[in-house]
């Protein structure tokens, strides 16, 4: 019995230190497709270096409002990067994310902004 218990304990410890394969889904708006293709590759390499875990990021792109509706209707997004705070607010109003999402990260949870030039 002791050998079995010791073997099981070693197996549990070994499993906990093995690298993990992580799958994430980023639900985003159309113009960010190429940006996130590049960013995801860089992030995956960084994550692997820091943790030893492999992370694969799938992307879903469409109009910002349509993507918000997809999340509201149940698409299992791990990350939401939409064009308008209004769209993210709609997700929060339906209880899919915390209503205080904008205060969660620096810069009102907006890692970048864009400027329109005429």
Could you say what each language-model-derived stretch is?
Residues 20-118:
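N-terminal segment of the mature folded domain
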Residues 10-11, 86:
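Short, linear, compositionally biased motifs with a strong N-terminal bias
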Residues 14-16:
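N-terminal signal peptide c-region/cleavage motif recognized by signal peptidases
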Residues 1-8:
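Bacterial N-terminal signal peptides that target proteins for export
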Residues 1, 19-20:
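Absolute protein N-terminus
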